[in-house]
């Protein structure tokens, strides 16, 4: 994670290393187009808190301004000429403006980070033709759309919000449910709650029906929690929580 580049190791079925390819910082997921060319890599480039004194205790600093944050990226490894001759193209988000993304409800929020640094590719899927890739940007509550033919990131699209006040939805926001023999009991359930939640997907897959590409996402929800930065809090820790 501390290196400027991550590595993808290409091996044959017997485990022999054919080539090692440098990709973006902190690779998280490796995927394939339908024809296996190119190989796709999502690299998060997550923030790294500074060390107070790495020669002694190696305790991380709690000062977020001292953290380093590498660019998130998507790497395209071309193996059409064989694994031993593989080449790589690394795409990042340098062309995307932070202010414009914020206006479109894309979360860009780590202190001092640009959009290119803050967006963290998590997981990748492609369409059936292998011409488009869809990349989850979990912490940003968004997905990136990649043109695999022209090797460019076309868009970063916010996934919006789930309205928990809608009729028929039941909301359980408590992590203090009682259990009996490991089974949840007496869940705290509310309806009509005036809250909106973010989807923040992790894994993504795709399928085609009636000529249309559909994306299926596992909406895990996530928070950033480091020694130098933590965004999570409970209602009890916020002002005005009693009135809610």
Which residues does each PLM region occupy?
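Beta-sheet-rich non-transmembrane sensory/scaffold domains
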Residues: 1-244
């Amino acid at each position: 994670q501390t290196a400027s580049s991550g590595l993808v190791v290409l091996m044959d079925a017997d485990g022999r290393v054919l080539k090692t390819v440098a990709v973006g910082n902190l690779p998280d997921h490796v995927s394939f187009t339908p024809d296996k060319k190119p190989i796709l890599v999502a690299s998060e480039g997550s923030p790294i808190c500074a060390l107070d004194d790495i020669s002694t205790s190696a305790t991380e600093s709690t000062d977020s301004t001292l953290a380093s944050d590498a660019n998130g990226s998507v790497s395209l490894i071309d193996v059409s000429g064989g694994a031993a001759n593989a080449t790589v193209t690394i795409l990042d988000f340098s062309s995307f403006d932070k202010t414009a993304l914020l206006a479109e409800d894309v979360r860009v929020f780590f202190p001092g980070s640009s959009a290119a640094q803050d967006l963290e590719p998590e997981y990748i899927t492609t369409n059936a033709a292998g011409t488009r890739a869809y990349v989850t940007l979990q912490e940003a509550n968004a997905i990136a759309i990649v043109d695999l033919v022209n090797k460019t990131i076309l868009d970063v699209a916010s996934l919006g919000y789930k309205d928990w006040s809608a009729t028929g939805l039941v909301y359980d926001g408590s992590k203090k449910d009682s259990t009996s023999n490991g089974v949840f009991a007496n869940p705290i359930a509310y309806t009509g709650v005036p809250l909106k939640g973010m989807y923040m997907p992790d894994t993504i897959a795709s399928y085609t029906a009636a000529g249309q590409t559909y994306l299926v996402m596992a909406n895990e929800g996530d928070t950033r929690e480091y020694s130098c930065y933590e965004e999570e809090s409970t209602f009890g820790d916020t002002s005005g929580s009693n009135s809610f």
